[in-house]
Regions:
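Conserved Rossmann-like nucleotide-cofactor binding loop
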Residues: 16, 40, 260
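N-terminal Rossmann-like FAD-binding beta1-loop-alpha1 element of flavoenzymes
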Residues: 6-34
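Local beta-strand N-terminus motif with an aromatic residue
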Residues: 5-6, 60, 250-251
């Protein structure tokens, strides 16, 4: 065991924090506590049931994995209490539905637009991840694909000027298609839909994605403390201060709160560390769940919307993930669609009217069942949704993270690491497991690096 580590405090009962506690327990280290500011587990992967009986996630989550440790945790916690799905996703483009990925299925655009995209792809010189995201897109996909889909869609998702973003994060996030593959799809009228790690995915039978983490928290017992908001941290004395005025000591601290908020909570933090944290950018998402008194109809999983006149960038056909996401599990009577609309410091959220804009958008795009009555409109705010990979992000993290580690503070998870490329649930769980092994056994972490 790492010397002098007798107490581990964990901030946040989301995927990373809970996985860390579970691994500490497995390693025989019992002196840990989780402090969660909310009333239940899940964090960004949480779920709620609205007053009308619809279940909603805090975003368009699906459960897939790169890691055996995540698979083992899911099997242990959920067993067979999950559905398995094959992805069926589309891009809503000019009234048509183009199978995802857009750039792999140009034959749905019609001859002229398909030709524009193919010529652009043929002439594209190839992008370097050393440049900005906007330049990388055009150099990789050419003008046609960039103009029609890549730029408008990513502007909607990131709510950030794309020139401010790096291109170092794209490996599992953006499907890169070559000219021969795109041409084959057009000429032979073949769909090319298999790309990506989420081509197949799982989803809990009831309770939404949050059910995974509610069960995991329950299995860990009373050392998971809810409604315990950390408001201050004395890194020298290794002391946490809480909103209720109480204090708790620690020897090692695993924080899954956003790293900018972690730094802001620290006493006597050097100016360079504070400035680096303040330079980090993120987007928020307004999640609007809309339930209808109508069967869900088509079996697609989710759909992307590059059109700037539509507020949301993605819609999830949530009743298709599990019938228990609608009242009484009655998908013969109810449909439910989870929409996501981004905002940021560059594009503030609408002050009012988003619910109406969303329901209008669902009707205009043909998602809403014809002549169906609204059964529920439920809005939630995910203030921290996407950690933006800006061009200055890595430099800022190289300033912050070593300073924290030198003081026994390990900032991990989607917003603790602030690295979107390792920001899925399986990544968060893996980071939690790895940091527990580092603390107890001194082992090197496998996916996180400063």
């Amino acid at each position: 065991m790492t010397s002098a580590i007798e107490r581990v405090a964990i901030i946040g009962a989301g995927p990373c924090g809970l996985a860390c506690a579970r691994e500490l327990e497995r390693l025989g280290f019992a002196q840990w506590r989780i402090y969660e500011r909310g009333a239940e587990a899940g964090g960004h992967a949480g779920s709620v049931r609205d007053p009308a009986g619809f279940t909603w996630d805090f975003g368009g989550h699906v459960v897939f994995s790169h890691y055996g440790e995540f698979d083992a945790l899911l099997d242990e916690v959920m067993g067979d209490d999950v559905y398995e799905h094959e992805r069926s996703s589309f891009v809503h483009f000019d009234g048509a539905r183009v199978p995802y990925p857009f750039q792999n299925n140009l034959r749905y655009l019609g001859p002229e637009l398909a030709l524009e995209c193919l010529v652009g792809l043929m002439e594209a010189p190839g992008g370097s991840p050393d440049g900005d995201f906007a330049a990388w897109m055009e150099a990789t996909f050419g003008r046609g694909i960039t103009r029609l889909f890549m730029r408008p869609y990513n502007v909607k998702v990131w709510a950030t000027p794309l020139e401010r973003m790096s291109a170092t994060w794209i490996a599992d996030r953006v499907s890169v298609v070559d000219f021969r593959r795109a041409l084959r799809s057009v000429l032979l009228a073949e769909d090319d839909v298999g790309w990506g790690p989420n081509n197949t995915f799982k989803f809990p039978r009831r309770g939404g994605t949050g059910e995974i983490y509610r069960r995991l928290a329950a299995s860990l017992g009373e050392r998971v403390r809810f409604e315990r908001e950390v408001t201050g941290i004395d890194a020298k004395q290794r002391l946490l201060r809480f909103a209720d005025g109480s204090e708790e000591g620690y020897d090692a601290l695993v924080s899954t709160m956003p790293i900018d908020r972690l730094v802001a909570a620290l006493d006597r933090c050097p100016g360079r560390v504070g400035e680096a944290a303040a330079s980090l950018e993120h987007t928020g998402v307004r999640v609007v769940g809309v339930g209808y008194e109508a069967p869900p109809g088509e079996g697609w999983s989710w759909m992307y919307f590059p059109d700037g006149s539509i507020p949301f960038y993605r819609v999830t056909n949530f009743a298709k993930y599990s019938p228990e996401n609608v009242p009484g599990g009655d998908t013969g009577t109810y449909a439910s669609f989870l929409t996501e609309t981004s905002y940021s410091s560059h594009r503030p959220p609408p002050e009012s009217g988003l619910e109406q804009a969303v329901t209008d958008g669902l009707a205009a795009t043909g998602i809403a069942p014809a002549e169906a009555n609204l059964a529920s409109v439920h809005m939630m705010d995910a203030e921290y949704a996407y950690p933006v990979p800006t061009r200055g992000r890595d430099r800022a993290l190289r300033t912050i993270q070593p300073w924290l580690v030198d003081r026994g503070i390990y900032s991990r998870g989607r917003f603790g690491s602030w690295r979107y490329e390792i920001g899925n649930m399986d990544h968060a769980v893996k980071m939690g497991i790895d940091v527990a092994r580092r603390i107890v056994e001194g082992r090197a972490e496998e996916i996180w690096s400063p």
